[in-house]
Amino acid sequence: MPILSKLNKRVRARVEEDDFEHFSQESASDGSELGEEDEEETDDSDGSTSESDDGSGRDGDESENEDLESDSASDANSDITSSLNNISFGALAKAQASLGKRKRSTTLTADIASKRPKGPSRSPPAPSSKEDQKYPNATKPPQKLSHRTSKHAPTIQSSRHAVTRKRTVIENPAIPQARDPRFDSVVLNHSTNGNPSIATNATIHASKNYAFLNSYRTEELSQLRKRLQNLQREKSKDTHDEREIERLKRQITSMSDRMRTFERKEMEREVLAGHRRKEREAIREGKKSQPWFLKKGDVKREVVTRRFTEMSGKEKQRALERRRKKIASKEKKEMPWARRGVE
């Protein structure tokens, strides 16, 4: 077979061979062959025109010749396909090695160009924004994280945030908290032989156990007031005395407020205890099936009424005046600045 014999030949590529000359020679040889075929066709066509007047017999001969030519062409194609099927891979490798790099690159580029869709060539867009100029080689510029809707919303963090490589080997010790044994439920639980009612109401039982401290506080408060009165009577313009007077005033107000809060809490406990006692008696007598629990607002209202009934005339006036000033200052804070100066 001619193709196998050609492929099995040892072919050595020329080093200084120019591809352009090779292709030009091939094209020239192809052109000469095509020219000869064209001349033959023209001769045939001239002969056919001259013989067209002879009759229908010659037309039949021409059709038979065309059939013979088509049969010969099909036989040649079948021979080529059969020879190509029998080619070994070694022969194909040798043929590929014999071809130059330029020929292979040109054929590859021609194949790629033929496969590409025909249309207007699109050049890559020039970097217009700052992000494109900052990241020219990146496929997608980094997206900026959106801001939070409010300061209470959770913060947004990128998943590409690098994790810290520092590791806490020894954690900081916990900050020790001050624990007063007078108000500690653990201490009271051990001291009362494990009575759960005392452990839960530790502050109540601690206040009962240390009720004598209130008498000490009242005595100290009276001594501070006497000392303040003595300093104010002297009316000295010494800066040291003025500072001492201010310090005593602050200390007296803080102690009096603390005593007032203790009294209010004690009164709240008395109100709750009296209400629970009444509810238990009503359930025991059958007047009620379930107890009624007071709310915090009801307890506070009951405490205010008790304090107001126990006050004297002057104390009531002072309390009402303080209440009025408190409400007025609250309303003034809610008032706009334009109206505050008028009133």
UniProtKB/Swiss-Prot annotation:
Location in or out of the cell: Nucleus, Nucleolus
Q: What is this protein called?
A: rRNA biogenesis protein RRP36
Described by its record, this protein's role is as follows: Component of the 90S pre-ribosome involved in the maturation of rRNAs. Required for early cleavages of the pre-RNAs in the 40S ribosomal subunit maturation pathway.
Keywords of the record: Coiled coil, Nucleus, Ribonucleoprotein, Ribosome biogenesis, rRNA processing
Q: Where is the composition biased (Basic and acidic residues)?
A: 310-320, 328-343
Q: Which is a Gene Ontology cellular component entry for this protein?
A: nucleolus
Q: Which residues form a coiled coil?
A: 214-266
Q: Is rRNA processing a UniProt keyword of this protein?
A: yes
Q: Which family does it belong to?
A: Belongs to the RRP36 family.
Organism, as annotated:
Paracoccidioides brasiliensis (strain Pb03)
Q: How does it assemble?
A: Associates with 90S and pre-40S pre-ribosomal particles.
Q: List the GO biological process terms.
A: maturation of SSU-rRNA from tricistronic rRNA transcript (SSU-rRNA, 5.8S rRNA, LSU-rRNA)
